[in-house]
Amino acid sequence: MNDFYNLLIKSDKITTSDEWDALYNGFPVVIALSTDELEDSFAKLNNADGYGYIATWRKNLFAFNPKLLSKRCGLIDENANLLKAARIPKK
């Protein structure tokens, strides 16, 4: 996870967080390095009302269907490139 995190934190869009793995433009990020970790990542994001982002390796996109992700949950890669936008309500 250190290699992934070190790549992710280099992005200007990512900041550190004590509560989450990181923050993407102020929203929670949970890292899922494999498809086996996706379920746990969803559970963690439910603590943020389900709104946030899952960060995964770009190569994992072939292993699962991003359309199966909740609309409240976005997807970013190891370089913090947006792969699927989260539908976050306006405040």
What are these regions (language model features)?
Residues L7, L45-A48, K67:
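Alpha-helix C-cap/termination motif
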